[in-house]
Curated annotation (Swiss-Prot):
Annotated residues for binding of cyanocob(III)alamin: T143, N144, Y145, Y146, Q147, D187, Q287, Y376, I377, W393, E394, H395
Record has Ion transport as a keyword: yes
Signal peptide: 1-25
Sequence similarity: Belongs to the eukaryotic cobalamin transport proteins family.
Molecular function terms from GO: cobalamin binding
InterPro entries: Cbl-bd_prot, Cobalamin_Transport, Transcobalamin-like_C
Function: Binds vitamin B12 with femtomolar affinity and protects it from the acidic environment of the stomach. Binds to cobalamin and to cobalamin analogs such as cobinamide.
UniProt name for this protein: Transcobalamin-1
Positions of the UniProt region annotated as Flexible linker: 309-327
GO cellular component: extracellular space
Region Globular C-terminal beta domain, annotated ranges: 328-417
Length: 417
């Protein structure tokens, strides 16, 4: 069972919607470069990076211009070895897109792997499979719109095949797949903004042919998505950092610029406040670092150099931290495992579930898969999360004044607003 969606980390990054000439306010100032050591050190923790999941780390290192040849070589080899062992059908479209971005970044020799294994062509086929599934299953993709946006962005950057009509049809900002936890998903919207921006540029540059109405439609989608992101009070997850380039090019009033500059300053302060927790995860550090150095995924195909100021790093231990749980959406089916008087984290809770399963697999049976963000429950008591039905299992925790804390897992459904 494939992961139905990437669980967001709520509210850990703000970004600024300001014109291009003032974009540097979104970026960490040179005097604060020393604070990036924690993020870079987190990405050096190879024990937490397995196989293809190293693509995020490799991409981040290259976009940020971090000079660590031995780490790049190790990550590249791990990814290639993992892919050679895998059946391509076991890769989601988004995973393949991320691998292409990582290998294609900064025009390194790894680009040969993309060509030799026809990865862009295979991504095009996977994108078609996503569209086909949407046509059959009430507009639900095999994965999610976050990955679908990565697909379009990657196909656009690497001149792959995709249909403009599919883009204009399925990337309407009012599509239900842009919603998560009862709200518009700014993470997904931000990736879509970059994907649509790349497509718009390709049309303007004559790289792909499209009708004027299609170009106008895409521009309206971009503007609508940006408006929706602004309406969510600028609170976004780690992934949203890649929308910075497009959003920084918007024409806004002086009053708005001043307000956004203030928000940008809070961005870095808030980042440092949370750095002792979630940013110690390699995947989290990888997603935020390039933006803090002024880079985005739209820079992937450029030949990038090292930052103006070298970021010296120190080796320090990076402990494993549990994944944060998303907000409750709507509960379809609930399994209550136990009642306890003290608070325990999700890792301990899963250990309890494993022990219970050994005692009675009928009542407490469950399956899970490991991801860079932590364990992901795929089924409980034979009831599976289902992409086509937009359902997934999540950890729940409730406590009443007169009762001990109750912990469990529930099958929830992603809903449109």
């Amino acid at each position: 069972m494939r992961q139905s969606h990437q669980l967001p980390l709520v509210g850990l990054l703000l970004f600024s919607l300001i014109p291009s000439q003032l974009c540097q306010s979104c970026v960490v100032s040179e005097k604060d470069y020393s604070h990036l050591r924690l993020l870079i050190s987190a990405m050096d923790n190879l024990e937490q990076i397995r196989g293809i999941y190293g693509a995020s780390i490799l991409l981040s290192q290259r976009l940020a211009g971090i000079q660590n040849p031995s780490l790049e070589e190790e990550l590249s080899q791990r990814i290639q070895d993992d892919m050679n062992r895998r059946d391509m059908s076991n890769l989601t479209s988004g995973q393949l897109a991320l691998i292409i971005l990582a290998f294609g970044a900064c025009k390194t020799p790894d680009v040969r792997f993309i060509h030799d294994h026809h990865l862009v062509e295979k991504l095009g086929e996977k994108f078609k499979e996503e569209i086909k599934n949407m046509e059959i299953h009430n507009s639900n993709p095999l994965t999610n719109y976050y990955q679908l946006s990565f697909d379009v962005l990657t196909l656009c950057l690497f001149r792959g095949n995709y249909s403009i009509s599919n883009v204009t049809h399925y990337f309407n900002p009012e599509n239900k797949n842009f919603n998560l936890s009862g709200h518009f998903s700014v993470d997904t919207g931000a990736v879509a903004v970059l994907a649509l921006t790349c497509v718009k540029r390709s049309i303007s540059n004559g790289k792909i042919k499209a009708a004027i109405k299609d170009s106008d439609t895409i521009q309206k989608y971009i503007e609508s998505l940006v408006h929706k992101i602004q309406s969510e009070k600028m609170v976004v997850s780690l992934e949203t950092r890649i929308a910075q380039e497009k959003l920084c090019r918007l024409s806004l009033s002086h009053q708005t610029i001043t307000k956004m500059n203030q928000i940008a300053k809070k961005l870095w302060t808030r980042c440092l406040t949370h750095s002792q927790g979630v940013f110690r995860l390699p995947i989290a550090a990888a997603q935020i670092l390039p933006a803090l150095l002024g880079k985005t995924y739209l820079d992937v195909t450029k030949l990038l150099l090292v930052p103006k100021v070298q970021v010296n790093i120190t080796d320090e231990p990076v402990p494993v931290v549990p994944t944060l749980s998303p907000e409750n959406i709507s509960v379809i089916y609930c399994v209550k495992i136990n009642e306890i008087s003290n608070c325990i984290n999700i890792t301990v809770f899963l250990d309890v579930m494993k022990a219970a399963q050994e005692k009675n697999s009928t009542i407490y049976g469950f399956t899970m898969t490991e991801t860079p963000w932590g364990p992901y429950i795929t089924s409980v008591q034979g009831i599976w999360a289902n992409n086509n039905e937009r359902t997934y299992w999540e950890h729940s925790e409730q406590q009443q004044i007169t009762k001990p804390r109750s912990m469990g897992i529930m099958l929830s459904k992603m809903e449109s607003i």
